[in-house]
């Protein structure tokens, strides 16, 4: 079984956020206007909270940590909405904030565990204890393999295979070139395949 079929089997669902581009653009316009921002913000949270939670949860595994990070993401969105220039989609901008928050959280976690335990091992333990996976052995092995990847590589892998984002979308979110992404994804896929064959 190859990685693509395992990922598909895992049930990676991309939420159809951008199903109505005009609606998204009008929401962005309402958020930029100081007078309508307070009314529009709950719509933004309603639209993006679930998919942002999915991305964050795949990175930090723990439900409680994911909830905290998602809350921080939307606080940052609220405080920085004036900085949204519309050069990318609202989706991309919010996902960039979310992925940066995840990477920062994991970096801090590693720094706190200096000389001590392995963060990947801790996440693997949470994978089992936090009911992240609904029991299937293949899914569990895949998730453990993904946890062996460096954080940014794991993020790219998750965005590509589970969120089913295009290379261009991932490049915009991670501020990386498409060529670098493809190379990173190739290495990640090879590492995961090796882990699954053990």
Placement of each model-derived feature along the sequence:
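Residues within helix-turn-helix
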Residues: 64, 168, 179
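Sigma70-family region 2
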Residues: 61, 74-89, 109-110
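Arg/Lys-rich amphipathic alpha helix in sigma70-family domain 2
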Residues: 83-85, 96-116, 193
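Structural recognition of an alpha-helix C-terminal capping motif at a helix-to-coil junction
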Residues: 54, 68-75, 88-100
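DNA-recognition helix of helix-turn-helix
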Residues: 4, 103, 142, 153, ...
């Amino acid at each position: 079984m190859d990685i693509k079929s395992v990922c598909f089997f895992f049930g990676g669902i991309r939420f159809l956020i951008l199903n109505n581009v005009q609606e998204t653009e009008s929401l962005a316009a309402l958020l930029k206007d100081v007078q309508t921002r307070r009314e529009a913000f709950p719509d933004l949270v309603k639209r993006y909270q679930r998919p942002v939670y999915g991305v964050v949860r795949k990175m930090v595994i723990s439900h409680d940590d994911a909830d905290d990070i998602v809350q921080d993401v939307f606080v940052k969105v609220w405080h920085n909405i004036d900085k949204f220039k519309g050069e990318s989609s609202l989706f991309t901008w919010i996902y960039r904030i979310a992925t940066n928050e995840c990477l920062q959280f994991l970096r801090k976690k590693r720094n706190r565990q200096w000389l001590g335990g392995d963060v990947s091992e801790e996440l693997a333990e949470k994978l089992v204890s936090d009911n992240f996976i609904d029991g299937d052995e293949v899914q569990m092995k895949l998730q453990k393999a993904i946890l062996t990847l460096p954080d940014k590589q794991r993020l790219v892998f998750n965005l590509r295979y589970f969120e089913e984002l295009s290379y261009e979308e991932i490049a915009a979110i991670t501020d990386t070139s498409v060529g670098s992404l493809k190379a990173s994804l190739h290495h990640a896929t090879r590492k995961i395949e090796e882990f699954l064959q053990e």
